[in-house]
A protein has these predicted regions:
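Donor-nucleotide binding loops and adjacent catalytic segments primarily
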Residues: 1-61
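A donor-sugar binding/catalytic signature common to diverse glycosyltransferases
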Residues: 47-96
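Peripheral, non-catalytic segments that deliver or gate enzyme domains
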Residues: 2-12, 88, 99, 116, ...
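Residues at alpha-helix caps and immediate loop-helix transition turns in enzyme cores, especially N-
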Residues: 9-12, 93, 145
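C-terminal amphipathic helix plus adjacent low-complexity
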Residues: 113-170
Length: 170
């Protein structure tokens, strides 16, 4: 998925399709703009939307733009990530997931040779797989995370506000 803000995704999808073909892998391309996608072989599905929470646990890896939401969902699914950032916070997110050992960062243009090499590395690297599963195991479930957030907000509400008024009183 190139993300919702990518306006020129033709090269990304063309390169990804060639990389999947080279590796003999199936894939699912997600975009609301099918005009950006070249004709695809039957091994690659094109969909405008699929819930990542349903898709990722059944996936071997994820190639994406590096947005924080997609990155977090892949962490929760415990799968390797190949981030191809192009804007905003994506560069920082991609660098961080690489430093964590859960994936790789591949800057644009993400050509098919580089995509296939990086994806093959991620799919074969046992240390990356183990690191992804370890991070997944350390993540709180939605209910636990919500409970912790509520506890944090309630504790913060008990503390007096320091709005700087005391410094200005006189």
């Amino acid at each position: 998925t190139p993300g919702s803000t990518m306006l020129e995704g033709q090269g990304f999808f063309r390169g990804a399709a060639k990389a999947l073909r080279k590796l003999g892998r199936r894939g699912i391309f997600l975009t609301k703009d099918p005009a950006q996608v070249p004709p695809l072989p039957e091994e690659i599905l094109l969909r405008p939307y699929v819930p990542m929470s349903a898709l990722l646990p059944r996936s071997a890896a994820l190639v994406h733009h590096g947005g924080i939401g997609t990155t977090a969902l892949a962490f929760a699914a415990g799968i390797p990530q190949l981030a191809t950032p192009f804007a905003h916070d994506q560069f920082d997110n991609a660098t961080r997931l690489e430093r964590l050992g859960c994936g790789l960062r591949l800057d644009a243009p993400a050509e098919d040779a580089a995509l296939s090499e990086a994806l093959q590395h991620l799919l074969e690297d046992e240390q990356v797989a183990a690191t992804c599963k370890d991070l997944q195991a350390r993540m709180d479930s939605g209910a636990v995370a919500c409970a912790k957030a509520v506890d944090f907000v309630e504790a913060a509400a008990q503390r007096p506000l320091d709005n700087g008024a005391q410094a200005h009183a006189g």
